[in-house]
Amino acid sequence: MSDSGASRLRRQLESGGFEARLYVKQLSQQSDGDRDLQEHRQRVQALAEETAQNLKRNVYQNYRQFIETAREISYLESEMYQLSHLLTEQKSSLESIPLALLPAAAAGASTGEDTAGAGPRERGAAQAGFLPGPAGVPREGPGTGEEGKQRTLTTLLEKVEGCRDLLETPGQYLVYNGDLVEYEADHMAQLQRVHGFLMNDCLLVATWLPQRRGMYRYNALYPLDRLAVVNVKDNPPMKDMFKLLMFPESRIFQAENAKIKREWLEVLEETKRALSDKRRREQEEAAALRAPPPVTSKGSNPFEDEAEEELATPEAEEEKVDLSMEWIQELPEDLDVCIAQRDFEGAVDLLDKLNHYLEDKPSPPSVKELRAKVDERVRQLTEVLVFELSPDRSLRGGPKATRRAVSQLIRLGQCTKACELFLRNRAAAVHTAIRQLRIEGATLLYIHKLCHVFFTSLLETAREFETDFAGTDSGCYSAFVVWARSAMGMFVDAFSKQVFDSKESLSTAAECVKVAKEHCQQLGEIGLDLTFIIHALLVKDIQGALLSYKEIIIEATKHRNSEEMWRRMNLMTPEALGKLKEEMRSCGVSNFEQYTGDDCWVNLSYTVVAFTKQTMGFLEEALKLYFPELHMVLLESLVEVILVAVQHVDYSLRCEQDPEKKTFIRQNASFLYDTVLPVVERRFEEGVGKPAKQLQDLRNASRLLRVNPESTTSVV
């Protein structure tokens, strides 16, 4: 597909006024045949694949947004965890108050003022100058003096190789640190032992140096504002793990136990929140320096009172919805009764009455509460109606048995669901009806039963669909056409299995296809033409049957040719001669009388007569199966069959030395060229509707005028 053609097609499909139906109609009118439509289909498919690739690329580009979403989820999870932890601590604190002595409480009042905003564990840690970390590792807090902070940083710089230049930042201090084990994210294989150092604005990950006890090497440094922490649920033996997300990578670490893991999660979230609050305060202070002039006071704005009155007016009106009527108060219970008694129409009538009453009214809390109760009943009613249309229910009632449930679903505003369930129910019914047909007797008898059952069911379904969904969205009709195409595929599967897979004769197959076409044309009564679908589904099987029968004729003709003695036929009795004349007249050979005499002799070879009957029979049966997609297959098969007989006559004429037999062969050749071929050509044109140039060329290229007496080979 060229770039210009692709861009032109893309612009056409992306235009605001694009209409698919008009586009397909114009395309069908402008195309020369099936090949053009196939090429256009390939172009549309290529454009669809290109669009899919662009969509994948856009999804990958939006991966950062996914990371941000995961980060916010982890924030929420951590906050919920901390809230639960704080509530537990507050509960234990309140329970311990009655047990404390009043003098002790008075003595502790002076020291409790500075730590009143923190939990018990944080208050004790603040008094000691540090927060306890895992396994005795100190967790420094912002309350530690400048000297302690500097001392902690100095110790850190001495233990970690390669981080001195990275951590010399004013105001930076150590908050928490501890040993961790890193795991591979995909296969959960252990990678290495690391040590984590959490600062007030970043997280440092360092690897162990096995040959140097207590020393580490710098591995990675992550700013806290770009870091998301996710708790990993325990899945033994993998437990006590948490994940760090840093676009575009993630790392999984395992703590020594559940307590240390909890400490890591808490302190990471606390530090991230503190950093966020600090930067927000800095932004607010910076914004305050360039704040706009003060807003006009309330007393100097004469319009503010009027605006407040206007805003208050709807609120007052919202409270005036009257829900005290008895039928509204009892509506939820009445809906329950209707659903229990399977009074679907009554339930929907009540809902319509309520919607009509509340149509133009506001939605104060009382109305919202009523709506919530009613919506729950609507959900229950929908579930019951869906069950009524499920294929598991009895299918004996036919399409009309579904009308009640379908109509109520449409009234509830669920037309699409009603359409889907109705068609699914009818598909199950059609499948069951086809499966219950007994295969017995002749194939044609079974096909008559199959066509009657299937097309009658399809016609009833179409009429019921038109009744139920009249006036609804046109998309439902598109869904019905798709369903009919699928149902036709189910029918063709059963049809082909019995007709073509069982190797029936071509005449039987032709009669069966004729019966199916006649039934399919009955759907035209309701404006539904599925003939092209049945053609498309049967073309492969019919083509195979034609080619198979062609090979049978060719083999039979070659076998007769091998035994050819070039003698006149002797039918022995006048009755046999009369029967042959009748057969030739039915084949379209009207001048057969000139090749017969007063006695029972026929001045033609048995091989030529048998070939004529077999070829004309093949043509008649093939024309019953004909539709445009099979034109070239039928034409090429006819030409190939005729060439076998013509070449045999030409070869025999060259090789025969007896003058009397040579004259007889010429008479048979004249019968083939002057009688049989024109009949084949005329009958083909009558059945197809247009002449066949290949047959004309075959007849016009008379072999009798090009015979080389010295040649002993046939001209192909």
UniProtKB/Swiss-Prot annotation:
GO cellular component, one term: growth cone
Molecular function via GO: phosphatidylinositol binding; small GTPase binding
Span list, region Disordered: 110-149, 275-319
Protein keywords: Cell projection, Cytoplasm, Exocytosis, Phosphoprotein, Protein transport, Transport
Compartments where located: Cytoplasm; Cytoplasm, Perinuclear region; Cell projection, Growth cone; Cell projection
Protein's name according to its UniProt entry: Exocyst complex component 8
Family of the protein in this entry: Belongs to the EXO84 family.
Feature: compositional bias, Low complexity: 110-119
Record-listed Phosphothreonine modification sites: T313
Subunit structure: The exocyst complex is composed of EXOC1, EXOC2, EXOC3, EXOC4, EXOC5, EXOC6, EXOC7 and EXOC8. Interacts (via PH domain) with GTP-bound RALA and RALB. Interacts with SH3BP1; required for the localization of both SH3BP1 and the exocyst to the leading edge of migrating cells.
GO process terms (BP): endosome organization; exocytosis; extracellular matrix disassembly; Golgi to plasma membrane transport; protein localization; protein transport
Pfam families: Exo84_C (PF16528), VPS51_Exo84_N (PF08700)
Modified residues (Phosphoserine): S15
Record function comment: Component of the exocyst complex involved in the docking of exocytic vesicles with fusion sites on the plasma membrane.
Compositional bias ranges of the Basic and acidic residues kind: 275-284
Principal cellular location given in the protein's record: cytoplasm
Residue ranges occupied by any PH domain in the UniProt entry: 173-273
CDD domains registered for this protein in UniProt: PH_RalBD_exo84
Compositionally biased residues, Acidic residues: 303-319
